[in-house]
Amino acid sequence: MKPIFSKIRVLGTAALALFLTASCSDILDEQPRSSYDPTFFKTEKGVEGGVTSMYAHLRYIYGQAYYYNSCLTGTDEATWGWSADGNFKDADLSGVGNLTATTCRSDALWGTAFSNINTANGVIENGAEVGVNESLVSEARFFRAFDYFLLVQTFGGVPLDLGSGELKFNITPSRTSVRNTVPEVYTKAIFPDLLTAIENLPANPRVTGGVTKTVARLYLAKAYLTYAWWLKNPNNIPTYPECQRTDPDGHDAAWYFQQAYDVAVTAIENPGPFGLQESFWMVSAGPNDRNMEILLYADHTQEDEYYNGGSLSYGGGVLPITLPDG
């Protein structure tokens, strides 16, 4: 019987080898659905998804408590309450806390804005290649300018190079960065993006609460006005990084004040679907929260926490808070 067992072992080994060879001949074609890699931006669906995420990112700024904390704590408008921790005490005017670079809640804006800026970079770089209309790409241009405008008002000069070059989509982790000056942020990023957006965006929103020419004009007028005041600097407020308060294009504060006025007038004379409400009550009434005065918003749902982006019953500080009215 020994030869028979030997033959069985040989045949079994050969069969196993044949099975392994056949099973490993094809490379597994992965189709990840819970996460995305940078090549997703090389597809039309990826570009469209990137633009959609930019509306959602508004919730993670204006819908989270720590952003408002970073705006109000440390002023005479608010103080810490009985259950407050260091998030609220550290920046309080009373000096009850210890404010440092690691205890302030500036991350509420910094982290959210820069991740969205990189997404916008990816959309802008790849949009034309995958055949997406420039009007959709200009929505990304608007949001990139939107975030840089928030950042430059809060921190002064901030990096335009996230690791792959100025205003380039970055996929390489980096622990260092170089902060551009305030004039560079305005003249290289904010103004060009908004001007291009105005030229290509529609008068009527593509989606409910979406970006339009009127919205872009509003932010361009605000950016011109803010930059003009920075150039004028009547109170001699220091800036960071230190730089001369001169415009790279040779314009002075008066020129930018005039530009702000002209853009605002154009927006008023060409409002699109927007207009003023008849009374302040109509602006503030809960059932009327999608009225003609609302130029931009990220809508939410009170039916599904996944699509809402935050709890429908609990406010945790970081996640968007959209609790039921009442």
Predicted feature descriptions by range:
Residues 2-12:
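Bacterial N-terminal signal peptides that target proteins for export
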Residues 12-21:
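Bacterial N-terminal signal peptides
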Residues 24-70, 100, 280:
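Membrane-proximal, proline-rich intrinsically disordered regions
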Residues 44, 48-62, 83-155, 172-210:
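Conserved, well-structured interaction surfaces
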Residues 45-46, 51, 55, 62, ...:
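Elongated scaffold/linker segments in the mid-to-C-terminal portions of large proteins
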Residues 152-153, 159, 205, 223-235:
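Short coil/turn linking the two alpha-helices of tandem helical-hairpin repeats
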Residues 157-179, 183, 230-259:
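Short coil/linker segments at helix-helix boundaries
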Residues 258-269:
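TPR/TPR-like (Sel1-like) alpha-helical repeat modules
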